């Protein structure tokens, strides 16, 4: 009798967990809500008052695309935010971001508090398989606390996590979705695929395609292949 009860509880718990996962992971359901990245910036910006924004700066070209993206949507993203969390993994990226913020703040009043978080790189280009696995595990462990702090600050506020970069974005998304599933702390994750991806997604893009709440491509030719994606033209 006791064994039967235990099995019933286990089956019930697993069923509830699977239902919860299906409700949280976007690939299992279709959202009819308007996406945050749209040409109607004024309308969307009004719906995102007191926004808590989290962006991650990948290195090199990823950082350049992210800076152009937030400049293009600065009214909706920066000027609507009360807190901006900036994740980065190299010093050059954060210097470029601070310079861009300074340029924007000269002509606009930014009331947001900016908080910087240094993440380890998930992997270095050219590293071996063993080295990559070790680096990914280390980054995942260290990212757990950082993402929880960011997630906690989003509680009670409209929030947006904007990603466009390397493998670290996968780790960030993993933790944010895990907290959503088990701690009931939702977050809106938007991934913008690189402009360089004209025919197929990057490896990060393929991993995040089923996980991101909104997946944005910058070439219309990708839409028939990835029907869940959204296209707003060239954003960067």
Swiss-Prot record:
Belongs to the ALG14 family. It comes from Kluyveromyces lactis (strain ATCC 8585 / CBS 2359 / DSM 70799 / NBRC 1267 / NRRL Y-1140 / WM37) (Yeast). This is UDP-N-acetylglucosamine transferase subunit ALG14. The chain crosses the membrane at residues 8-28. The keyword Protease does not apply. One of its GO terms (biological process) is dolichol-linked oligosaccharide biosynthetic process. Heterodimer with ALG13 to form a functional enzyme. Residues 29-236 are cytoplasmic.
């Amino acid at each position: 009798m006791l064994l039967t009860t235990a099995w019933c509880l286990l089956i019930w718990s697993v069923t509830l967990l699977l239902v919860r996962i299906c409700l949280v992971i976007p690939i299992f359901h279709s959202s009819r809500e308007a996406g945050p990245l749209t040409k109607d910036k004024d309308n969307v910006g009004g719906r995102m008052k007191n926004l808590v924004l989290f962006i991650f700066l990948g290195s090199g070209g990823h950082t350049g695309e992210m800076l152009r993206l937030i400049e293009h949507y600065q009214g909706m993203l920066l000027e609507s935010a009360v807190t901006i969390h900036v994740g980065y993994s190299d010093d050059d990226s954060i210097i470029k971001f601070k310079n861009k913020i300074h340029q924007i703040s000269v002509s606009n009043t930014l009331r947001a508090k900016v908080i910087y978080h240094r993440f380890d790189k998930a992997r270095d280009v050219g590293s071996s398989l063993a080295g990559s696995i070790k680096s990914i595990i280390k980054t995942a462990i260290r990212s757990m606390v950082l993402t929880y702090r960011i997630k906690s600050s989003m509680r009670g506020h409209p929030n947006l996590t904007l990603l466009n970069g390397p493998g670290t974005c996968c780790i960030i998304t993993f933790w944010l979705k895990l907290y959503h599933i088990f701690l009931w702390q939702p977050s809106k994750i938007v991934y913008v695929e690189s402009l360089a991806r004209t025919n197929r997604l990057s490896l990060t893009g393929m991993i995040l395609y089923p996980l991101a709440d909104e997946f944005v491509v910058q070439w219309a030719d990708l839409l028939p292949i990835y029907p869940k994606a959204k296209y707003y033209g060239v954003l960067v």
